[in-house]
């Protein structure tokens, strides 16, 4: 019984940050155009993570895109700037997106 409790606590500790970042993405309206595993208006976060995989400065590059927007990378629909997202929030969201496998 004790081992089961430890396993549950460990799982909760790992999943808590995932839920926090998903909540932040929802609060900042990211989820209006993106989903974790499927393309909506914009690419899935899984696809974004794959595109930036292995790049040393991926968190900073993606954070800049989240704040300033961009166009031409994922098709004809541009991503608008997101002035409601602070630099710290953008980096937190970027790290979360890049962790998705």
Q: What function would you assign to each model-found segment?
A:
Residues 1-21, 101:
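N-terminal export/targeting leaders of redox proteins
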Residues 51-61:
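Short microdomains enriched in Cys/His and/or Lys/Arg
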Residues 32, 41-52, 65-94:
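Axial heme c-ligation environment in periplasmic c-type cytochrome domains
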Residues 19-36:
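Sequence/structural segment immediately N-terminal to covalent heme-attachment motifs in c-type
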Residues 96-100:
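C-terminal alpha-helix
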């Amino acid at each position: 019984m004790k081992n089961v409790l430890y396993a549950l606590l460990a799982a909760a500790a790992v999943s808590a940050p995932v839920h926090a970042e998903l909540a932040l993405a929802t609060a900042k309206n990211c989820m209006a155009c993106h989903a974790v595993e499927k393309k909506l208006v914009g690419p899935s976060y899984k696809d974004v993570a794959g595109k930036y995989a292995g790049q040393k400065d991926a968190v900073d590059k993606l954070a800049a895109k989240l704040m300033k927007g961009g166009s031409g990378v994922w098709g004809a629909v541009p991503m608008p700037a997101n002035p409601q997202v602070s630099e710290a929030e953008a980096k937190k969201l970027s790290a979360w997106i890049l962790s998705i496998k």
